[in-house]
Amino acid sequence: MAFVCLAIGCLYTFLISTTFGCTSSSDTEIKVNPPQDFEIVDPGYLGYLYLQWQPPLSLDHFKECTVEYELKYRNIGSETWKTIITKNLHYKDGFDLNKGIEAKIHTLLPWQCTNGSEVQSSWAETTYWISPQGIPETKVQDMDCVYYNWQYLLCSWKPGIGVLLDTNYNLFYWYEGLDHALQCVDYIKADGQNIGCRFPYLEASDYKDFYICVNGSSENKPIRSSYFTFQLQNIVKPLPPVYLTFTRESSCEIKLKWSIPLGPIPARCFDYEIEIREDDTTLVTATVENETYTLKTTNETRQLCFVVRSKVNIYCSDDGIWSEWSDKQCWEGEDLSKKTLLRFWLPFGFILILVIFVTGLLLRKPNTYPKMIPEFFCDT
């Protein structure tokens, strides 16, 4: 009787396992299938790809369990995997299309459905490559993009090595919010070739991955495409600070002050670098967060000059580009100012005395004429 019950129990377990897509060799060992139809899809967004899959076989009736998936992916050659655990059947992320992509995924069954321990399926794997055309040397060289004053994006490049004069390059870009990739409409040219792009106003493009592809064409040989990804706030080059001033706080302190650069960047987003010089020799170089700097000084006779430049700080970006230096502002100590005034007033005083003397002579000459005229008539 016990043997019959045991046989019935085993048969029941087998039927349940078959129905739910799992197999069980004991009460604690359950196996689950990996996801189906795992693939990487390129929607034409220059590096922003879709990873998608279908549920494992025979899990449609597993209603009491929430199935999860562990997804790992990376560019081929990268040392680390990105890992995501999700309940969805798709995931999106950006990749470097200059390299291949590899990804793998498996199914996770939670402990509530598996007698107290999580069950993982085997891995399903896939890869994706852009079919390369042309040798690597034909792609653009020295690509450089700058977001000037957080307003205007400009990218420039040099032609590939050994390309012929008929080679021309075209730039395409995309960021989240655009329906499709757009081509540059305002190229910078040199000798008839496109060597850069001036972008239009980029609405709602901050703090998003910005994808660029520069491809090329030539009648003589294929040209290799290049892909670039960055975020605009990390390549901002602001304007330099303005309205530099000095204020003597005490006999041993001078306060340097300036105003934030013109433009849309908030004051809280700036770092500043100051360079202070004494007689063309660098005295101090400092980085500050505010628009003031107090300098300790003991020699009142020296001349001090300073310049300031700005950069977007870590509170508003991960990186940035220093602005150009501001116009130079100089201050002179008291004694030196007196000497300067003396050098100015000495020649001016001499000229003033000379003018007074000559004026006096001219005013005295008319007084001699009345005496001379009567004497002249008396002699006749």
From Swiss-Prot:
Residues the record marks as carrying a glycan: 115, 215, 290, 299
Broad class of where this protein is predominantly found: membrane
Pfam family, one: IL6Ra-bind
Extracellular topological domain: 27-343
Described function: Cell surface receptor that plays a role in the regulation of IL-13-mediated responses. Functions as a decoy receptor that inhibits IL-13- and IL-4-mediated signal transduction via the JAK-STAT pathway and thereby modulates immune responses and inflammation. Serves as a functional signaling receptor for IL-13 in an alternative pathway involving AP-1 ultimately leading to the production of TGFB1.
Keywords: Cell membrane, Disulfide bond, Glycoprotein, Membrane, Receptor, Repeat, Signal, Transmembrane, Transmembrane helix
Family to which the UniProt record says this protein belongs: Belongs to the type I cytokine receptor family. Type 5 subfamily.
UniProt topological domain (Cytoplasmic) ranges: 364-380
GO MF annotation terms: cytokine binding; cytokine receptor activity
A biological-process GO annotation: cytokine-mediated signaling pathway
Induction: Expression is induced by STAT6 and NF-kappa-B.
Disulfide bridges in this chain: 65-113, 145-155, 184-197, 269-316
Protein name: Interleukin-13 receptor subunit alpha-2
Subunit annotation: Interacts with IL4RA. Interacts with high affinity to interleukin-13 (IL13), but not to interleukin-4 (IL4).
Location within or outside the cell: Cell membrane
Every Fibronectin type-III domain range: 34-134, 139-235, 240-333
UniProt short sequence motif WSXWS motif, positions renumbered to this chain: 322-326
Gene this chain is encoded by: IL13RA2
UniProt xrefs under InterPro entries: FN3_dom, FN3_sf, Ig-like_fold, Short_hematopoietin_rcpt_2_CS, TypeI_recpt_CBD
Signal peptide positions on this chain: 1-26
Transmembrane stretches, start-end: 344-363
Presence of keyword tRNA processing: no
Membrane topology: Single-pass type I membrane protein
Organism name: Homo sapiens
Record note on modification: Cleaved by MMP8 leading to a soluble form that is also able to interact with IL13.
Any single GO CC term annotated in Swiss-Prot or TrEMBL for this entry: plasma membrane
